[in-house]
Amino acid sequence: MEIVAENRKARFDYFVLQEYDAGMVLVGSEVKSLRQRKVNMGDAYVLEKDMELWIHNLHISEYNRSDRKNHKPLRVRKLLLRKREIHKIAGNIKVSGLAVVPLMIFFNNKGIAKIKIAIVKGKKLYDKREAIKTRDWQREKSRISRREV
């Protein structure tokens, strides 16, 4: 598995409730751009329309060696999942306070581009502060243990 991009901010801003791996409908120049790791998914989110999932604001840069038939960087892309997974995710989108965001884009062992999406719930400010304190304490603990050895 070759990781192309990771949305680390999503793990900080949200509680991850459930994760899914999905395929994406892409054109050739988008795949080539993904191989060059020219993707930004900081503002990306998933919406449901007609029992299909669509990812919005996923910026895949134009492939620089492509001709004039290049793709649009911010076009809406369809996600490919099983029907029961789509029903489950669509039901969670309608629940107040829950959202679906991308966590990671990767190429699987067969070389197919996949995206890991998650059903998330937003963190409050005090939850974010608690996460920072925990992370700092773990870092300090590892420094202390290295000094003692």
Curated annotation (Swiss-Prot):
It comes from the Bacteria. One of its GO terms (biological process) is trans-translation. InterPro entries: SmpB, SsrA-bd_prot, SsrA-bd_prot_CS. GO terms for molecular function: RNA binding. Pfam families: SmpB. It is found in: Cytoplasm. PROSITE patterns: SSRP. Its main location: cytoplasm. GO terms for cellular component: cytosol. Keywords: Cytoplasm, RNA-binding. HAMAP family: SmpB (MF_00023). PANTHER family: SSRA-BINDING PROTEIN (PTHR30308:SF2), TMRNA-BINDING COMPONENT OF TRANS-TRANSLATION TAGGING COMPLEX (PTHR30308). Required for rescue of stalled ribosomes mediated by trans-translation. Binds to transfer-messenger RNA (tmRNA), required for stable association of tmRNA with ribosomes. tmRNA and SmpB together mimic tRNA shape, replacing the anticodon stem-loop with SmpB. tmRNA is encoded by the ssrA gene; the 2 termini fold to resemble tRNA(Ala) and it encodes a 'tag peptide', a short internal open reading frame. During trans-translation Ala-aminoacylated tmRNA acts like a tRNA, entering the A-site of stalled ribosomes, displacing the stalled mRNA. Belongs to the SmpB family. This is SsrA-binding protein.
